[in-house]
Amino acid sequence: MWDQGGQPWQQWPLNQQQWMQSFQHQQDPSQIDWAALAQAWIAQREASGQQSMVEQPPGMMPNGQDMSTMESGPNNHGNFQGDSNFNRMWQPEWGMHQQPPHPPPDQPWMPPTPGPMDIVPPSEDSNSQDSGEFAPDNRHIFNQNNHNFGGPPDNFAVGPVNQFDYQHGAAFGPPQGGFHPPYWQPGPPGPPAPPQNRRERPSSFRDRQRSPIALPVKQEPPQIDAVKRRTLPAWIREGLEKMEREKQKKLEKERMEQQRSQLSKKEKKATEDAEGGDGPRLPQRSKFDSDEEEEDTENVEAASSGKVTRSPSPVPQEEHSDPEMTEEEKEYQMMLLTKMLLTEILLDVTDEEIYYVAKDAHRKATKAPAKQLAQSSALASLTGLGGLGGYGSGDSEDERSDRGSESSDTDDEELRHRIRQKQEAFWRKEKEQQLLHDKQMEEEKQQTERVTKEMNEFIHKEQNSLSLLEAREADGDVVNEKKRTPNETTSVLEPKKEHKEKEKQGRSRSGSSSSGSSSSNSRTSSTSSTVSSSSYSSSSGSSRTSSRSSSPKRKKRHSRSRSPTIKARRSRSRSYSRRIKIESNRARVKIRDRRRSNRNSIERERRRNRSPSRERRRSRSRSRDRRTNRASRSRSRDRRKIDDQRGNLSGNSHKHKGEAKEQERKKERSRSIDKDRKKKDKEREREQDKRKEKQKREEKDFKFSSQDDRLKRKRESERTFSRSGSISVKIIRHDSRQDSKKSTTKDSKKHSGSDSSGRSSSESPGSSKEKKAKKPKHSRSRSVEKSQRSGKKASRKHKSKSRSR
């Protein structure tokens, strides 16, 4: 083909140059009808094949290649390397374009038809384009089916040209073929003549010749058979393959649209069924997803195989494939990508979570056994043996140390967490206790304030009532004293003065005692003392006025006593005054009792508040004493045991006797010590009992004192009433006796009456004072009897004096 029996072939380059110049001005090669072009090329080839067969020498093959030249290898390129036109034609023009140099359709000469070849019928692999094989005898003949048809042979050497590997993106040196990579197979420089038999070909060559999508496609031009197709040049075959691929894409799009329409119908039906049914139902799964996944994998494989195969224009294919995608397809691909990404993310996250959970569970499970192994003596004994130490590895020890450190860290964290929880609980309890204590203190303060307010109000009310009663008594006394005789007034006023003086003394004592107890009580006592002093001053003033008024009326006494009407008036006024006095005394006694009861209640509360603190102190002191006693007893016992042991160690009989004596002495000492201890304990118990008895006595004395005060007041009131009654009886008897002795002269009667009245008035207060000093204060009956005896004695003395005169 190339040398034509040693002569260079000059028509092909010239025609090729003309065709290249014309092809540059043509339209896009994708718009060419490759089927018609292939048929025209086959027709021209058949027409020109007959002439070439006639002109061809016998020793040459139809392609113009000699057997010797094919076998010689690299030595058959001398003419081509020396020709300058050849290098000028191949290097600049073929390197400029990515499209192969297609021969012009109106070319006058075409390569001759091949010679006799043994063509094997197509095998089962119907899609492969290399199913035909040469005979073993013609193995070294140039193969028309490979991609080097229409170009220089593989062993032709050309100057170095930069190449680019589309698979890896790295520049490397030219192969031995020396031609541009888009038109020759990329790959490392191999042997000069690769094996052309199918069995000896590499697997990449077989994969390269197959179509990327193995789908049954209908071939429109039925005139072109598989055998004729193999005879076509590579650039025509590539054009045909492009056409077939476009047709396949169209068919796939139609099929996808049909499937989508079917899916939409099925989904509508499923939604209608779900709405009509009771519960929600899952959509029926179609085969569309799986088919799409398979198609994606096939497209990926096709893309990978397309990189290996020789493609004249890979960039325009991608550019043309992008606009061919519809919006629905793009959306569907985006959905698939999002599904893939979401599933991958979900799987990654779940894997991480499962790993961490399993790690935590494993760590918790291995905590306790790891500690037990570390602390066990059996493991230490095993590790101490020399033979067993070599079985362990460094990795296992590191892992154990890591586990131990992790377990220790977790233990520390747990302990800290527990400590924090306990501290928080303790702080909460303290706060609650403080709040409760504050509330109790506030309540106590409020109670004390209420009690003080009530006491003050009660005291004010009592003072007002006392002032009213005293005013009434003063008015009644003034009225009664005006009506009484001077003897009666003097006799009645003296016991009143004495009674008031005693009450003053008792009040002063009670005021002094209460002032020492509390400030509030001192205030109440001071107010009561001031009120009593004011009442006493008013009563004393009234008595003075009554005494002054009664002194000039002594002369008229005899005349008044004689009339019976005057006696009746006196008895009425006395009874009325007695009633008023009794009521006033009762009111005063009640008021005093109330005051004392309030004071006693306050003092009892204070003692109760103090008593638990005292009991606590006593219990603490008792516990300390008991501890000291126990410690001393334990020491004495230890000493005895030590002495006994020492005595047992000595083996001599003399020593035994001495030890027995010493033991007896020690026993006596211990007995004496025990006796002393018992005595001390008894004394302490007695002291405690005495203290308790003292407390009880104090309480009883306090109760008795309160009762005695009440009894004293009652007795004093009764004494006053008895004295007033006895004086009135004496006066009545004296008047009756004077009336019976009227037989004597008037002068003597007047003198005797005046003297006796003066003496009786003067003697009666003195005798009453002496008798008061002699009277006991405890029994009520004694006071009544003494008052009666004193009245009898006074009457007897008065009788004796009157008789003597």
Swiss-Prot record:
Alphabetical GO CC annotations of the entry are: cytosol; nuclear speck; nucleoplasm; plasma membrane; presynaptic active zone
**Sites of Phosphoserine modification:** S204, S211, S290, S304, S313, S321, S465, S467, S726
Q: Which InterPro entries match?
A: PNISR
Q: How does it assemble?
A: Interacts with PNN.
Q: Which residues carry this modification: Phosphothreonine?
A: T485
Q: What is this protein called?
A: Arginine/serine-rich protein PNISR
Instruction: Enumerate composition-biased segments (Acidic residues).
Output: 290-299
Where can this protein be found?
A: Nucleus speckle
Q: Specify residue ranges for compositional bias: Basic residues.
A: 551-579, 587-598, 607-639, 771-781, 789-805
Keywords, A to Z? Coiled coil, Isopeptide bond, Nucleus, Phosphoprotein, Ubl conjugation
User: What gene name is given for the protein in this entry?
Assistant: PNISR
Ranges where the record places region Disordered: 74-331, 382-805
Q: Where is the composition biased (Basic and acidic residues)?
A: 197-210, 238-258, 421-463, 470-486, 494-506, 659-721, 732-753
Which tissues express it?
Expressed in heart, skeletal muscle, thymus, spleen, kidney, liver, placenta and leukocytes.
Q: What is the lineage of its organism?
A: Eukaryota, Metazoa, Chordata, Craniata, Vertebrata
The coiled-coil regions, if any, are 237-276, 429-461, 673-703
Tell me a Gene Ontology molecular-function term this record carries. Answer: RNA binding
> Where is composition skewed (Gly residues) in this entry?
384-393
Organism, as annotated: Homo sapiens
Bias class Pro residues marks the residues at 100-115, 183-195
The Polar residues compositionally biased stretches are 74-88
> Where on this protein does the Glycyl lysine isopeptide (Lys-Gly) (interchain with G-Cter in SUMO2) crosslink form?
K218, K496, K703
Sequence ranges of Low complexity compositional bias: 508-550, 754-767
Entry's family note: Belongs to the splicing factor SR family.
Superkingdom of the source? Eukaryota
Among its keywords, does the record have Nucleus? yes
